[in-house]
Amino acid sequence: MSNYHPHSHPHALSHPHPQQVHNQLQNPHQNQLPPPQRHNHAAPTAAASASGAPSSSASASASASILVAHPPQPLISNSLAIRQEIQRFESVHPSIYAIYELIDLLPMADAQIAQSIRDHVVCIEDSFVNSQEWTISRSVPDLRLGIVGSLNSGKSALVHRYLTGSYMQEESPEGGRFKKEVFIDGQSYLLLIRDEGGAPEMQFAGWVDAVIFVFSLENEGSFNTVYNYYTKMAHFRNGQEIPMILVGTQDAISERNPRVIDDTRARKLASDLKRCSYYETCATYGLNVERVFQDACQKILSQRLPLPPQVQPARPTTPQGNRLGLAPYQAPTNGQRGQQQLPLRMSADFAQAEQKLWSLQAASSSTINENNNITKYNPGAANSLQGDCSQVQLRDPRDLAPPPGKELPTPTSTPTTSRKSRRRSNLFIPSSSKKADKEKEPKSSELGSGRSIPIKQGYLYKRSSKSLNKEWKKKYVTLCDDGRLTYHPSLHDYMDDVHGKEIPLQYVTVKVPGQKPRGSKSIITNSALTSSLMANGQRAQNTLSDGIGCLTLAKDNQRKLSEKLSLLGAGSIAAGAGGEPLKSNSSQQTSGDEGIAMSNSNSQTFIAGEVANAGNKLEAQTPNVKKRHRRMKSSSVKANEADDNDGYEFYIVSLDSKQWHFEAANSEERDEWVAAVEQEIFKSLQSIESSKTKQATSTDLAAMLAIRQRVPGNGFCVDCGAPNPEWASLNLGVLMCIECSGVHRNLGSHISKVRSLGLDDWPSPHLSVMLAIGNSLANSVWESNTRQRVKPTSQASREDKERWVRSKYEAKEFLTPLGNGSSAHPSPSPGQQLIEAVIRADIKSIVSILANCPSEVTNANVSARDVRTPLLLACAIGNLAIAQLLIWNGANIKHTDHEGRTCLAYARAAQSLATAKSIKAAAAAQAGTTIPAPAPPTNGGIPAPQYNVEDTTALVELLEGLGCPEAAPLTASGTLPRRRDTLGTPYEKSVSGVI
């Protein structure tokens, strides 16, 4: 048994003898000692002094006596907690001795069992002795996270998924305690997770740094429990001090248990909890699980960030000797900055060091670069800070300043406080005109580098497109002159050209919430201007300026009224300006005294510019503008309140109903972005005007046609036989009807990744899988043994189709198991069979093996010495479809072979071979010669790799996008490394030969 000395604490009791423990077990009411009550109050702690601090004018002895005589409530609470912890700690040792006594009472026949129990108790004892409080370094930071929720909330599955990466359906009634290492901003932290089995108590509320409230989206009771638990926690601790996260779990949602808590109610609860984020998670396939805990850790660290000291007005005080001083310290409570007074006995040296520390922190925080919106250094502020801290300093702060005649050293790097406060000469003050010109220039920190400067750029908030967690995130948005709108997470990502996304502007329009489309806004015009317009059509056309569809009405060459039009209104403006107004489908009442009417093709379009007759000057334009705004906002909400409610948002809508929501800082910035985007949309439409009449013969349309017609079985739904399916499952490689696609979505994306043939994007890897498998091949695997069950038809009910689909893909009832061979000739392992199928490019065998085996089979090695995996072999032969299938089924893209080469290195080698082959074929075609056909395969019938430039290039891009590392560098070893030829190195033979 290990040496066990936990009772070195002054409150500790002596160790009881085993016989005493045995006697206590027999007579539990004897020899029971009361809890220790001895407490030394002669030197109160800082925390205790803070709670009951006397005034600064009181003497030190009087203050100490007051604290001892009447301990405040925080001191009582801390004392009680300390005594309870001591009792808990001391109760372990007698219990362990009691277990040893009971083990000794076991008969000799059970000696082996007794020894096994003794060994386990020793392990428990060692773990207790070496617990975190005695062993871990003080420099290791910890994060305390609490998880609360009802028994059927799904919190245990959420924690289990985060810790293990797997799904556990059973709920743990007693909760649990867990530890995990997390990395945040490159720093390692010890995360302590406390899964509370019941309602939060006082101890739990005082322990946590953050709380996650969990409820199930299909259980009303778990949702109401969150309210009760939050109310109970509020009795023990201020909710404003604790970061909170609300999580709704989707694990129990099914056809029988539909969702009952909609998104609106959940977000209402999150807003009621204050400072609370809301997520919807699914522990079954890991949706948002990592994100929830990462956000909780970030919130804890944000709560702990020290706030810079706030400068207070100088209050002169008389320094005293060794007394109970008042040291200002930061109290980051409720997100507000403020100073509190901490009673603390200070010596003169400590007071002087403390004063210097606060002065340096204030100076460093006030000299940050102005681009970070921190004010310049103010010497008066520093003096006031010194005055505020002078109540604990024993020397005049002027004694710390250098002599007046001594010149300060000139720094060579960033300007310091002293350098900024030095007097400058008036000889080289820049002129005001140059300074104004310099201010007009854009700051270099606000512009991207490395590329041409876009038309418009800046930070906007973008709403997440995920339906489960629609939140606003700050993005760096750029509007390019080639008809693209790009956005990146930050300016640095834009400068590095990483993590960016783009929106092509050829087939989109821009809208502002709460406003009608810009082409449908109208200002009703005087009908008398119609004849003038037709007579002066050319002159009216000349007034179109300033961007897309901007209409300018010049009055006395000074007053102008501009109305921006949408793209749909541009065509009608041109028609109207040509001299003939377009007829409206709806009648409009005109007042007969107004200026211009602008609308789209559904109403009259009149344009009144600088009309030739100057006598027709109109004075009543402004009232119509107000009328137009009243029509635009027909509700009782004021026009100036509409912008506030909309939040200065605008959104871009594409032809396939995709939307990108953005939000600007104010209405002016939003209007600038909308106008700039409209201008680029107009330019993009003009640039493709000549190509509109051409036939649509793009690669995507050809690929879609090939998927429908060339792949066997794709003319009908894979599960019910409905004709002309329009939906697909990517990882299964099949087409299905819209009703079966809904069933596939309910299975989860880990079983079936559903996409639309006509609405979604189809990158090359997805197309290659669809072209390689198809409905006929997939059904030959997934329906190879239907056990005489009748397949539903297209007229069958949805319930019948769902039962068939779940039995087919989820339960895998119709699969034929892999053959084991005979005892004399056993079949290879599934991993070796998969390697064999990859080398032969046998798609059917690959689909069958992946369907029958767990994901670990995708990382099998060729042999003990040849550690190549199926993914490495697929990349070596440049097979894009097989590589994508393996990646979807859990293949490790970071695995390296025995020489440190990754799958990306193999893919690049295949790309080089494909490029060389293509160049050779092009040269032969230009020379008029023919390339001899390759010799038939001689190595067991293995087909020669057919390297294709498009497929290998797409494979390289796929691996790069997934973050696959480059080839690992060679490490020093005791033997010479093998030659690093790309594919010419003689590898060990696999089951079927050598690649």
UniProtKB/Swiss-Prot annotation:
InterPro entries: Ankyrin_rpt (IPR002110), Ankyrin_rpt-contain_sf (IPR036770), Arf-GAP_GTPase_ANK_PH (IPR051282), ARFGAP/RecO (IPR037278), ArfGAP_dom (IPR001164), ArfGAP_dom_sf (IPR038508), P-loop_NTPase (IPR027417), PH-like_dom_sf (IPR011993)
Polar residues: compositionally biased ranges: 331-340, 583-599
Stretches for region Small GTPase-like: 137-340
Bias-annotated ranges (Low complexity): 15-32, 42-56, 409-418
Family of this protein: Belongs to the centaurin gamma-like family.
Gene source species: Drosophila melanogaster
Function recorded in the entry: GTPase-activating protein for the ADP ribosylation factor family.
Domain annotation PH: ranges: 453-682
Protein's UniProt name: Centaurin-gamma-1A
Domain GLD: 138-322
A Pfam family the protein falls into: Ras
Domain of life: Eukaryota
Sequence positions that bind GTP: 149-156, 193-197, 249-252
GO cellular component: membrane
Region described as Disordered: spans on this chain: 1-56, 308-340, 394-451, 576-599, 617-640, 970-995
Biased composition (Basic residues): 1-14
Positions of C4-type zinc fingers: 717-740
Basic and acidic residues bias spans: 434-444
Keywords of the record: ANK repeat, GTP-binding, GTPase activation, Metal-binding, Nucleotide-binding, Zinc, Zinc-finger
SUPFAM superfamilies membership: Ankyrin repeat, ArfGap/RecO-like zinc finger, P-loop containing nucleoside triphosphate hydrolases, PH domain-like
GO terms classed as biological process: medium-term memory
Residue ranges annotated for the Arf-GAP domain, each copy included: 679-822
MF term (GO), any: GTP binding
Membrane-crossing residue ranges in chain numbering: none
